[in-house]
Amino acid sequence: MKKKDFRFLISLLLFCTPAILSAQRIKGSDTLLPLTQELAEMYMKLNPQATITVTGGGSGVGISALMDGTTDLAMASRRIKFSEKLKMKQSHHEPCEVIVAYDALAIIVHPDNPVKQLTREQLEAIFRGKITNWKEVGGSDAKIVVYSRETSSGTYEFFKESVLGNKNYMSSILSMPATGAIIQSVRQTKGAIGYVGLAYLNPYVKALAVSYDQGRTYVYPSVENAVRKTYPVVRPLYYYYDKANEARVRPFIDFIQSAAGQDKTLNIGFIPITNSVQQ
């Protein structure tokens, strides 16, 4: 038996144990939604007495739910804000942070779009409304239709920070309530552009290579390039919980961070917190 397979088997056996409490609620980031759903199903198969419900809505929605006690774990693609942390502490709750994976953010366009790559500066100009036609970046003579996540999304905030340099998005940007809505809109609109987590990529949209050195080198979004640190748009993904609730949520968190959980993380299209991508 290979060392990796043995480690995976031991990891599974360790988590075939009774859950401390039978039900957990997890809410928040759409980026983390597919990963958490897959891992929750895997965990419940190993622990039939456990019940985990997972819903999206965005990082801000998840953290708000944690603050008002309507979720046990908040999924977030951004760090908790100082104001959110302060509000929890004022209510005598202590927020705890766990990194469960990393994610590469992919820039997507319609598959028929001839453009294959963009610089960070070009992306900034597009999402700020300074570049409005694809011919300005080597494409066809067609209007650029720009899609973004809503302001409650951690991905919205990360893109603003990493790509726009904390400058404002264009006022006429089309805000989507979920990542799936961006995928669907870009798929159906030939002049569209948007951004999604790597795990959401499919054959119906085209991911672009990105340059963060003013066009000298372009790198395609992939797990391998993210692990090698050659792809520039990578961020950590978080779970937040109330410290008083740690006994309830810790078994599932430990499972995610185990060898079995991290192998599944890689298979779904996220970057593990371990080095398991290196064979």
Question: What spans do the regions from the language model cover?
Answer:
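Generic N-terminal leader/processing signal
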Residues: 1-2, 25
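Bacterial N-terminal signal peptides that target proteins for export
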Residues: 2-10
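Enrichment for repetitive, rod-forming helical segments
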Residues: 10-14, 34
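Hydrophobic h-region of N-terminal signal peptides that target proteins for export
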Residues: 13-22
